Amino acid sequence: MGNSEIAVVPISAIEHFEYCPRQCALIHVDGIWADNPHTVRGSRAHRRTDDPTKSRKERGKRMLRAVPLWSERYGLSGRADVIEVSEDGTVRPVEHKSGVRHGITADLQVCAQAICLEEMLDTSISEAAIWYGGPRRRFRVDLTPDLRRRTFHAIKEIRQHLVKGVLPHAPNDSRCPQCQLRHHCLPETSANAAEVAVYLQQVLSV
């Protein structure tokens, strides 16, 4: 199935979706974006990996930076921070994050990168990696069947939002205070929209 037949999902949308489907829709359906200290720090952390001219060899491995990725089969497109190529030809994507590890949101993103690389290079990739700037530590990500299944599920859900233009309900939970789109999302108001609608119906029916 080619990209001409399905909506292309940005790889970056996968992490947004896993964090909050409403945040993902605001960014990738409505085109809304705002920075906060977390996103600014992330942008600064990516300055080095965003420059393809910085590709070089480290410890016997080629480090290719800012590599465009795509998958015709799954309708994906994006860019890898770093593609690590070992002397034996082994390839793995390495995602760079400025903060600390929280759950598997970034794991899904780097898994999607590996899926693209497998198609582009006609190869199999068993592991990827994520480098976190907070602890300055690299974590290995095993590309297990379960992780791939969750990644494909996220891709499917995101594509439905893109096609239908659906804006999910706001969760209005512990994620919201840290979200850079809080003032666009209005979680307190959105989460209570159904209650407000019922109240208005009751008032107008009197």
Residue ranges and their predicted role:
Residues M1-V91, S98-R101, N192, Y199-V206:
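Metal-dependent nuclease catalytic cores that hydrolyze phosphodiester bonds in DNA/RNA
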Residues S43-R44, V110-A112, E157-I158, E195, ...:
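Short, charged/polar low-complexity linear motifs in solvent-exposed/disordered segments
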Residues G31-D35, D51, E157, H161-K164, ...:
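A structural signal for alpha-helix termini and helix-coil/disorder junctions
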Residues E72-G78, E84-G165, H169-H183:
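Nucleic-acid nuclease catalytic cores
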